[in-house]
């Protein structure tokens, strides 16, 4: 969920949706909550937690959105499994994150700066490895890249 800088304004356009935001960082969650309060969002709830051990029932969500998270998650496989578990049959998993191998300069920066600060944690997906991983779980997968970022939309089988 992060600070909500990209999502909170979007959520204002979805007044009938029930939106649940989860982040491991209390600081990030606090910043997102402040943005939601300033926008008077009444349909958004916040919960601190670990994407690798989601505190929700199987099939609890119609849509799971993950923006710029997977390159930072410490246990990526657990995150993929948990997201699949909490997504209802026919639900949509979408998002974006850094993938290695698309931009040498970005790869260098990730290794020498972001990893050292703890913002990114290896191992990283490549576009090819992500496509294979998602196609094993989901009935339909669409993905593309913009420089070193991959975006994807996946549909879980009914």
Predicted regions and their residues:
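A short acidic, Gly/Pro-enriched loop at the edge of an enzyme's catalytic core
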Residues: 52-63
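Class I SAM-dependent methyltransferase SAM/SAH-binding core
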Residues: 1-53
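Short conserved AdoMet
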Residues: 14-15, 74, 88, 135
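C-terminal lobe and adjacent flexible extensions of AdoMet/dcAdoMet transferase-like proteins
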Residues: 152-158
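A short glycine-rich, Lys/Arg-flanked "PGG" loop and its adjoining helix->strand segment in the class I
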Residues: 77-89
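C-terminal alpha-helical "lid/dimerization" subdomain adjacent to the S-adenosyl-L-methionine
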Residues: 94-152
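Conserved Rossmann-like nucleotide-binding pocket used by diverse enzymes
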Residues: 20, 47, 65-66, 94
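A short SAM/SAH-binding and catalytic strip from SAM-dependent methyltransferases
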Residues: 63-75
């Amino acid at each position: 969920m992060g600070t909500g800088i990209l999502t909170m304004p979007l959520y204002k356009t979805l007044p009938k949706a029930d939106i649940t935001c989860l982040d491991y960082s209390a600081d990030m969650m606090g910043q997102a909550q402040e943005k939601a309060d300033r926008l008077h969002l009444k349909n958004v709830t916040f919960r601190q937690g670990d994407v690798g051990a989601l505190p929700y029932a199987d099939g609890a969500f119609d849509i799971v959105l993950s923006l710029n998270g997977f390159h930072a998650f410490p246990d990526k496989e657990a995150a993929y499994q948990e997201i699949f578990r909490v997504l209802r049959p026919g639900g949509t998993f979408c998002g974006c994150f850094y993938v290695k191998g698309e931009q040498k300069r970005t790869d260098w920066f990730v290794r020498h700066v972001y990893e050292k600060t703890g913002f990114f944690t290896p191992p990283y997906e490549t576009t090819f490895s992500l496509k294979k991983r998602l196609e094993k779980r989901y009935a339909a997968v669409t993905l593309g890249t913009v420089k070193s970022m991959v975006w994807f939309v996946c549909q879980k089988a009914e």
